[in-house]
Amino acid sequence: MIGAWTVGEQTTEELLAGLPIPAPVIGAHPGVYSPSVDSALLCRAVLGELDRRRLDGRAETTVLELCAGSGIASICAALVGATVTAVDDTAEALAAIDGNATANGVAVTGLLTDVRALPASVTADVVIANPPYIPAPPTASAGHAWDAGDDGRDVLDAIIDALPARVRPGGGVLLVQSDVCGVDQTVHRLDLVGFSAAIVDEVPLAFGPVMASRAEWLEQHGFIAPGQRTERLVVTRAVRDAEV
C-alpha cells in the first residue's frame, strides 16, 4: 500500500470480500503498486462484464489489462475462464503478475511494454485499465504508478485514443480513475473515438497519502475545491454502440 491509509485499506478489503469469487491471493512485490480501492473496483467491474458476456452467449472472452501492476484484475478475469494478457512497463510488475497468477493457479500472458508502444496486433474483446491518474506537479518524483502529468491524463488519454484499434468488434472497455482528473473528459473523449460510455460504479473516499500531500497544489490549480479532501473513484464502461 502507498503508506498508511486506513480508510482505503478497509474499503479495499470490503470490495474484495464482496466479489462473486474468492479474492485472489496477491503477494507483496517491491516496486509494484499494491491492490487498493481502484484495483478492487476494476476487479468488480471486469467480473461483472464477463458475467454479462456469458449471459449474452459470449462465453469465450479475451481480456487485455493495461497498466496491470500486480495483475489482480487480470487474475480475477482468468479465474472465471477468460484468456488474459496483462501489460505493464516494469520488469518488477511482470514478475509480480507471473508469480501472482501462478499462486492462483491461472495463466496470464505478460507483456513488458509501455501502453503507448503496444503493437497494434494486440487486441481483445474487453480492454481494462487502472492507469496512473493523479495530477502531478513538476517536482513530483517516485510516483510512476500513480502520477500522470500535470492534468492526470497523460496515460488515460493515450489509452483511449488507441481503443478503436485495440477493442475487437462487439467488445468493451472498463477504465478506473479519480474524478479529480476529469470524468466528463473521459466520457467525451471516448465518444470522440466512437465509443458510448457511462459511469457504472463509484466509491467516495478520503484522500490517501499521495493526494493529501499535494492537496494545496491541487487546490491552486483548480483540480479540487478549497478544503476538499475527498475524491470519487469511478469506473467508466464503454462500448461501440449505444448500449451502455
PLM features: residue spans?
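Short, electropositive alpha-helical surface patch
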Residues: 181-195
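SAM-dependent Rossmann-like transferase core, predominantly class I methyltransferases
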Residues: 2-80, 96, 219-243
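Residue-level signal for inorganic ion chemistry
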Residues: 39, 130, 159, 173
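Glycine-rich S-adenosyl-L-methionine
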Residues: 142-168
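Conserved beta-strand signature within the Rossmann-like core of class I S-adenosyl-L-methionine
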Residues: 170-176
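Short strand-turn motif at the edge of the Rossmann-like AdoMet-binding core
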Residues: 132, 176-179
